[in-house]
């Protein structure tokens, strides 16, 4: 039988590219979670709009940021997976959101 940690770490990965219109709502849905054992990773494909300005507003809540050109969505997702250290992995892409502040509980 596996020992399950009573407070597992969630690695949440947001993959984004030129998503300034929808990204802030996504980030806010993470930073307002009442569950605290969350590792937040953002993988940006080298955005040329205001995406990084939004990301920088929340930098104290983002554990890892990668911003560089990639080979598409799945390449960016794989970068995030390699960086994740959590017990559980969740993709929450730009425009998605956790709709309640206790979603991870």
Where are these regions (language model features)?
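Nucleotide-sugar donor-binding/catalytic module of glycosyltransferases
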Residues: 1-105
């Amino acid at each position: 039988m596996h020992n399950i940690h009573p407070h597992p770490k969630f690695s949440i990965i947001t993959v984004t590219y030129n998503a300034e219109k929808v990204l802030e709502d996504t980030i806010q849905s993470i930073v307002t979670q009442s569950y605290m054992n969350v590792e937040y990773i953002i993988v940006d494909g080298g955005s040329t709009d205001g995406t990084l300005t939004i990301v920088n507003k929340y930098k104290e809540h983002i554990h890892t940021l990668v911003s560089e050109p990639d080979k598409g969505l799945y390449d960016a997702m794989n970068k995030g997976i390699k960086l994740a250290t959590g017990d559980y992995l969740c993709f929450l892409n730009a425009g998605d959101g956790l709709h309640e502040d206790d979603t991870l509980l």
